Amino acid sequence: EKKVTDKCAFYGVPLCKVPDRYVLGGAIGKDARVVVAVTDEGFARQLQTMLDRSLWG
């Protein structure tokens, strides 16, 4: 986790943490995932919005 956090901070990449790998996988329609990189800005914004709604109400 620290390595990914440090890399994101160094390169100025937004980071969104979720409680477990199943939430992350479900958000992109896949099986459990530990890390996902999203290069499409529109999809990244929508994914972050969906995760925020599902995790924090």
From Swiss-Prot:
Job description of the protein: RNA-binding protein that recognizes the K-turn motif present in ribosomal RNA, but also in box C/D and box C'/D' sRNAs.
| Organism from which the protein derives | Geobacillus stearothermophilus (Bacillus stearothermophilus)
> What protein name applies here?
RNA-binding protein YlxQ
- Where is the organism placed in the taxonomic lineage, from the top? Bacteria, Bacillati, Bacillota, Bacilli, Bacillales
Similarity field: Belongs to the eukaryotic ribosomal protein eL8 family.
Keyword line: RNA-binding
One MF term in the entry's GO annotations: RNA binding
Q: Please, which domain of life does this record's source organism belong to? A: Bacteria
Q: Which InterPro entries match?
A: Ribosomal_eL30-like_sf, Ribosomal_eL8/eL30/eS12/Gad45
Which Pfam families does the protein's record reference?
Ribosomal_L7Ae
